[in-house]
A protein has these predicted regions:
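Active-site segment of extracytoplasmic enzymes that catalyze sulfate/phosphate-ester chemistry
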Residues: 68-69
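FAD-dependent flavoprotein oxygenase/oxidase catalytic domain
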Residues: 206-210, 220-227
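The conserved 3'-phosphoadenosine-5'-phosphosulfate
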Residues: 387-404
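Glycine-rich phosphate/pyrophosphate-binding loop and the adjoining helix
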Residues: 404-416
């Protein structure tokens, strides 16, 4: 009979990316013990350059500027760039983990195989790699949703190399090749630009038109301008009019002038595509825009407009499957239709000890939003333990269907898998902050807010034995 280690006084946090770290930190502030299970060898998720499971390429940069990506109680150093690249993002997250003592609670190179709840018990049995089982008082799922590649299927066969953008790291495999990028999201645009600077020829196949935002408007980060405009509380049609005007004045105007498809939806009804150089490369002829693929023909590709191109490498920048939970039965996630039905995408309507952090898609500012989710979670768990009467209102709230106004402020995103989890970040952020205020409780011993990041904080501590072994 398999022995089950008793950790019923603790929470199991699955994942040590930005969401998992925020979850662990907030739980620990309320004296709730945690084990953070991470399948890679360090914290940081996709931003950890040594993570073999990362889907990020070496040149990747955040599309959110410093003021809107940092955790509220852990400012990004002033000497970091406006848009963090992979190394700075990793340094920031690892510094956060060190400052709040999260490394001591993390178990690296471990995998959660299965999570189950046995009949009659509110606790969770977590099975780890090697068959080890533990009983936890609660579980926080923070494994992210950009790790299960989605690849299209086309008629015909292709004789060259096919890869998904999740496999792409550097432009080395593209040098001297004729490259076709499929997909017009941020990653597809970034890789297309790198290809244009290294490959013999670069083609970009885009099925659906979209609006392309530069990283700067009027000399300021685009998200800073966007936030300021929305504070004017203008009607949505007026915001769209201003947005189109900003794009025409500050970037390159209409995408169709560069051979790209015309957007078939209104401005703001999509996940933002932010890239300052794609249209420049298109305008200089180093990238050729193409419509959707009609057929693969050996070393050539036929497009829906009847044109053909000789191609050596195809890179599918076609996103990820958004609803992958391979370690827990869907019945535990209140699954209905295409996705789990969780209050504000995080809180189970029935279970008081199962939470999902980071299960949303937003155009900007997702790290602090994960932190707000974690703040609500930790406060709720704390109130359940010390003041059940004050916790009841949130138990009732999370059992009710969330309204569109709480998620997207009335914006109707066009139907696409990438939008299944899409929220309008300002509206969603306000909804979370409102709940935090209503909780009316702060950690007994609030974490010290650092004014700077000493150099020692940026050094990654040596990884030691597992947290459970350390507790033994």
């Amino acid at each position: 009979m398999t022995t089950i280690a008793d950790r019923s006084d603790a929470y199991c946090v699955v994942g040590a990316g930005a969401g998992g770290l925020a979850a662990a930190k907030n739980l620990m502030e309320f004296g709730i013990d945690v084990d953070v299970i991470e399948r890679a060898g360090d914290v940081g998720g996709n931003w950890n350059g040594d993570n073999p499971f990362s889907a990020a390429y070496d040149s990747i940069h955040l599309i959110t500027s410093k003021p809107y990506i940092q955790y509220d109680d852990f400012p990004i150093p002033d000497d970091y760039p406006t848009y963090l690249g992979r190394s700075h993002a990793y340094q920031y997250l690892s510094s956060y983990a060190r400052r709040f003592g999260l490394y001591e609670h993390a178990e690296f190179n471990r995998t959660v195989e299965w999570i189950e709840r046995r009949d009659g018990s509110p606790e969770w049995i977590v099975t780890l790699d090697g068959g080890e089982k533990r009983r936890y008082g609660g579980v926080v799922i923070a494994h992210g949703h950009n790790w299960a590649p989605r690849c299209p299927s086309y008629p015909g066969t292709f004789n060259g190399v096919i890869m998904h953008s999740s496999e792409y790291r550097t432009p080395a495999p593209l040098r001297g090749k004729r490259v076709l990028l499929v997909g017009g999201g941020t990653s597809g645009c970034d890789i297309a630009v790198e290809s244009a600077q290294n490959a013999t020829a670069t083609f970009l196949s885009i099925r659906r038109g979209c609006y392309y935002w530069p990283k700067y408007l009027f000399g300021m980060p685009t998200d800073v301008v966007y936030e300021r405009v929305l504070k004017w509380r203008m009607p949505r049609p007026v915001v769209r009019t201003f947005g189109k005007l900003f794009l025409r004045l500050n970037s390159a105007g209409q995408p169709e002038r560069y051979g790209l498809p015309k957007p078939g939806h209104k401005l703001l009804e999509e996940h933002f595509v932010i890239n300052s150089t794609l249209l420049y490369e298109l305008g200089h002829g180093r990238i050729a825009a193409k419509p959707d693929i009609a057929e693969l023909r050996g070393d050539r590709v036929l497009f829906t407009d009847g044109s053909e191109a000789e191609v050596d490498v195809i890179v599918y920048a076609t996103g990820y499957r958004m609803t992958e939970f391979p370690f827990i039965d869907r019945k535990h996630l209140n699954w209905t239709g295409r996705t789990p039905q969780l209050y504000l995408n995080a809180f189970h309507p029935v279970y008081d000890n199962l939470f999902v952090i980071g299960y949303f898609q937003t155009s900007t500012g997702n790290w602090p939003i994960m932190d707000y989710q974690a703040k609500i979670m930790s406060r709720y768990i704390h109130l359940l333990r010390v003041d059940l009467k004050r916790a009841i209102w949130f138990r009732r709230a999370k059992a009710t269907p969330v309204t569109a106004a709480q998620l997207n402020g009335g914006i109707k995103y066009y139907d696409s898998e990438r939008h299944w989890l899409q929220v309008e970040h300002i509206t969603y952020r306000k909804s979370l902050r409102k709940l935090i205020r209503r909780m009316g409780v702060e950690p007994p011993a609030p974490a010290e807010v650092p004014g700077s990041h000493p150099a020692a904080d940026l050094a990654v501590p040596a990884q030691s034995s597992s947290a459970v072994a350390a507790k033994a």
